[in-house]
Amino acid sequence: SGSKTANIGDGCFGVRLDHIGTTSGMGCGRPRPKPTPGGS
């Protein structure tokens, strides 16, 4: 689940909540707020 997270979760919610952050879009509304440690 690191590939998909690094893709959109990189600037959204690049943590372990890829399945949650991707669905809920926690901060995913922006193009890329900030590279969260974990999405890479």
UniProtKB/Swiss-Prot annotation:
PROSITE patterns: NATRIURETIC_PEPTIDE (PS00263). Keywords: Disulfide bond, Hypotensive agent, Secreted, Toxin, Vasoactive, Vasodilator. Its main location: secreted. GO terms for biological process: regulation of blood pressure; vasodilation. The keyword NAD does not apply. Residues 1-8 form a propeptide. Expressed by the venom gland. The keyword Disulfide bond applies. One of its GO terms (cellular component) is extracellular region. Residues 20-40 are annotated as: Disordered. InterPro entries: Natr_peptide, Natr_peptide_CS. Disulfide bonds join C12-C28. Pfam families: ANP. GO terms for molecular function: hormone activity; toxin activity. It is found in: Secreted. Snake venom natriuretic peptide that targets both NPR1 and NPR2. Exhibits hypotensive and vasodepressor activities. Belongs to the natriuretic peptide family. This is Natriuretic peptide PpNP-b.
